[in-house]
Amino acid sequence: MTTNYIFVTGGVVSSLGKGIAAASLAAILEARGLKVTMMKLDPYINVDPGTMSPTQHGEVFVTEDGAETDLDLGHYERFIRTKMTKRNNFTAGRVYADVLRKERRGDYLGATIQVIPHITNAIKDRVIAGSEGHDIAIVEVGGTVGDIESLPFMEAIRQLAIEVGREHAMFMHLTLVPYLAAAGEVKTKPTQHSVKELLSIGIQPDILVCRSDRMIPANERKKIALFCNVPEKAVISMKDVDSIYKIPQLIRSQGLDDLVCARFGINAPEADLSEWEQVIYEEANPTGEVTIGMVGKYTELPDAYKSVNEALKHAGLKNRLSVTIKYVDSQDVETKGTDVLNGLDAILVPGGFGDRGIEGKIRAAQYARENKIPYLGICLGMQVALIEYARNVAGMEGAHSTEFNKNTKYPVVGLITEWVDGEGNVEERSEKSDLGGTMRLGSQLCHLEKGTKAYELYGSATIHERHRHRYEVNNLLRPQIEKAGLKVSGLSADKKLVEVIENPAHPWFVAAQFHPEFTSTPRDGHPLFAGFVKAAGQFQRGELK
């Protein structure tokens, strides 16, 4: 099978939405019956985003095989059915590390290692390996054209397009077309300069996707086509919309997928976007609204919780409810008290690291438990719920996690030193292990106990969910907590690690060690989030019992 490549680049400014545009195109091509995959090439020197600050980079998305990747891979999985793996995202740091490792081994037989050809060849090899077995691979290059860091990647995709043949490669470039209110018109000059920069490194775009707050007028489209050397029909308007799930229809209406199929000589049926039409209908026609408080420490940047935000929206679609997320800094709960949690229909404590704001999260879990407010804890959100219950119900005064207090009398949460991964291999860690890539990562099997809330929600005794953590419930103290009434409803494959807890004395109090948000999609939702948002609606109406 010959794979066709669409290389996606961006210009003028960052954060234009390359990932959304690429994923939307992928969704349309998939709806035409094509086998599509996506890749993200990140020019930064970090080996992966696993140890990067969420306030700088946004969330770390975890794939089924345990790769810590860019949040754009979350967009990819939410738009298409293909599951991402460690092959679908790599960084300049990863490429350089691999090349240097080979040089130390002597694989290059004494050659002088250079960006061209060694780094560019390594990039091309990874792109080819990650796209095998697919009709179309959409490859997004991070950053903005002109960045020093992205030059090796730009050179690599330029070379690869020549090597596979231009009949099997396309370049799609996203640019900004700003509207100047004073002049009353959109300006095309930034796009012209961006394409000029791209041409200077040997890449002629085949498609221009123009980001603006409005549709690009016909005269301006003609002007862009003329000065940027692309057909007028290849100038695509991508205006601001109130939902990212409207983008597939927006670009389909302008024939972007037809351009791609014509270029690659693909004869495929028309795209069936009925599933996306249903998503848009559900989003536009809610029967009610709920407010969910997200208590975390990275609340100044919503992208730090991108998958959780989207999962809540998906759950809203399944319940025909509009979900408003109120971000609550956990430090505010510490300094201002639980009054900041008043008026919420449900409380969610997501994952996180570090002790800043930890007591605020614990108090939020206590507030939800005592006031019978629906509570969903994810990863650290499960651990704080357990700590709170141990302290205030089980009589274990000062109970804590060894992540935050190594000398606690009741270490109800501690470092995992050994576990079995998703492939059955035994993994071992210690406090001296590196931070990067040393967590329990990826999809793991979980056993759910029949008759529990978790089992009721999933409708199955076995599930697979993705993990990203290095601390777990201390089994030595577990019996004391369970005796006080807390229910362990989910266990790992070897039955040694606690995966799900719930409070039978509460109408809806569930917390999981895994990250269910990574598998939620707009078309299918996720049972845990769907049940949580449903409970929020019932709580608001006074029907939750």
Curated annotation (Swiss-Prot):
Pfam families: CTP_synth_N (PF06418), GATase (PF00117)
SUPFAM superfamilies named among the record's database cross-references: Class I glutamine amidotransferase-like (SSF52317), P-loop containing nucleoside triphosphate hydrolases (SSF52540)
Binding-site positions, L-glutamine: G352, L380, G381, M382, Q383, E403, R470
Database matches in Gene3D superfamilies: 3.40.50.880, P-loop containing nucleotide triphosphate hydrolases
Residues spanning the membrane: none
Coiled-coil segments on the chain, per record: none
Sites where the protein binds ATP: S15, L16, G17, K18, G19, I20, D72, K239, D240, V241
Organism: Vibrio cholerae serotype O1 (strain ATCC 39315 / El Tor Inaba N16961)
Name assigned to this protein: CTP synthase
Function of the molecule: Catalyzes the ATP-dependent amination of UTP to CTP with either L-glutamine or ammonia as the source of nitrogen. Regulates intracellular CTP levels through interactions with the four ribonucleotide triphosphates.
Subunit structure: Homotetramer.
Activity control, per UniProt: Allosterically activated by GTP, when glutamine is the substrate; GTP has no effect on the reaction when ammonia is the substrate. The allosteric effector GTP functions by stabilizing the protein conformation that binds the tetrahedral intermediate(s) formed during glutamine hydrolysis. Inhibited by the product CTP, via allosteric rather than competitive inhibition.
Binding locations of UTP: S14, K187, T188, K189, P190, T191, Q192, K223
Residue span, Glutamine amidotransferase type-1 domain: 291-542
GO biological process: one example: 'de novo' CTP biosynthetic process
Binding site for CTP: S14, D147, I148, E149, K187, T188, K189, P190, T191, Q192, K223
Domain of life the protein comes from: Bacteria
